[in-house]
Amino acid sequence: ASPMYMAMLTSAVANGGNLMTPYLVEKIESYTGTTVKSYTPKIYKKLMTTQEASKLTELMTGVVESGTGSALSGRGYTAAGKTGTAEHGDASSTTPHAWFVGFSNVEDPDIVVSVIAEESGSGSEVAVPIAQKIFDAYYNN
């Protein structure tokens, strides 16, 4: 799966089971700062029930509060996520890819982050610190 695909699935969890249509540009402004065109989030389709999304959010929050994503705990925002270590090729001779997918502001999600660090080890040691920097930058701007 690609980081974009994983971000989309994670956003469905964050949005109560609704898979949103991805977009890269929120708005277009003229040189004077006037909004020329803006895009609003749209539901693509329902991937899971609200109850399923809530249970996944609960489990992903546990990963951050007391599991492999705990480096994101106590940072001034809530987060939910999942780490991963993906083997590839000949697992005996390659270093695994490090993954993290998650979202912040759990009660009213703001941002989804998907990180893959190829051939770098475990998700908790490599991908979570990268995600932490992204979340921190988002909330400190």
Language model region names:
Residues 1-43, 51, 60-141:
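Active-site beta-strand/loop architecture of penicillin-binding DD-peptidases
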